[in-house]
């Protein structure tokens, strides 16, 4: 397959990912097929975002690492000492992706390290490994282009997380601001009683203790439920089951108390 055709296949990853959740496993599989090597997409903290194996490595430690989806801490830290593509590192390199305890088996193992950069910062590392065949210039062009595409997707995912965070916070603030003073007071007592994200409460008991009517509690819960902040379900004589759906709610409630 020609270099241009392989480049187009990598490019299609971007088009396929548009508007969908990022799938690093599929990206790793695509890179495995066009570069013909084992592929590991590793985050800044060593989390294995995606991987695809071309040549199986029979080693218990490696298997556990793939199951846990986590690279060793020291290895991850050392990757930051590689500021640019470093190719064809042998089994004796500290950056080898082959198990050094089986050095004899993987004597011909070669590793290439490609930093994933985006927005001017190091986002992670693309690690490629294969047995015997050296990584040629065409492989490195594809690896660096692949790392750029992965970097763009990591940035997109980060931006979406920030956007979702802001949206969740805004929904909570609007829901809380819609409560009257007595409703807000009722809600504070309810979640003190729950002491967590979900639980059972008896509205009449809280109403008696705080000195408010039961209808105030019901109205407050209804407002939060219609905003999608909580869900509540009546369990008859047992009381009302409440679950927090928006993880920003309890934080905002705590902030209100401290002011």
UniProtKB/Swiss-Prot annotation:
DNA-binding global transcriptional regulator which is involved in the adaptive response to starvation and acts by directly or indirectly controlling the expression of numerous genes in response to nutrient availability. During rapid exponential growth, CodY is highly active and represses genes whose products allow adaptation to nutrient depletion. This is Global transcriptional regulator CodY. The keyword Phosphoprotein applies. One of its GO terms (molecular function) is GTP binding. The keyword Repressor applies. Belongs to the CodY family. Residues 1-155 are annotated as: GAF domain. GO terms for biological process: negative regulation of DNA-templated transcription. It is found in: Cytoplasm.
């Amino acid at each position: 397959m020609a270099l241009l055709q392989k480049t187009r296949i990598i490019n299609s990853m971007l088009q396929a990912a548009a508007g969908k959740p990022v799938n690093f496993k599929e990206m790793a599989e695509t890179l495995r097929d066009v570069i013909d090597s084992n592929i590991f997409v590793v985050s800044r903290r060593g989390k294995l975002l995606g991987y695809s194996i071309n040549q199986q490595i029979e080693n218990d430690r490696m298997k556990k690492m793939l199951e846990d989806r986590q690279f060793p801490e020291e290895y991850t830290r050392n990757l930051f000492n590689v500021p640019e593509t470093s190719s064809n590192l042998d089994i004796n390199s500290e950056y080898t992706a082959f198990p050094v305890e089986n050095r004899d088996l993987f004597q011909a193992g070669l590793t290439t390290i490609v930093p994933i950069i985006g927005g001017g910062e190091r986002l992670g590392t693309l690690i490629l490994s294969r047995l015997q065949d050296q990584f040629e210039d065409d492989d490195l062009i594809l690896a660096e282009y692949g790392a750029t595409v992965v970097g763009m997707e990591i940035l997109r995912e980060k931006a979406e997380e920030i956007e979702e965070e802001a949206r969740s916070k805004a929904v909570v603030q609007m829901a809380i601001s819609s409560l009257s003073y007595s409703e807000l007071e009722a809600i504070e007592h309810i979640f003190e009683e729950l002491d967590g994200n979900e639980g059972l409460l008896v509205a009449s008991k809280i109403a008696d203790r705080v000195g408010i009517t039961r209808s105030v509690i019901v109205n407050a819960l209804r407002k939060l439920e219609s905003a999608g902040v909580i869900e509540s379900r009546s369990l008859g004589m047992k009381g009302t089951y409440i679950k927090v759906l928006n993880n920003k709610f309890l934080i905002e409630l705590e902030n209100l108390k401290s002011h």
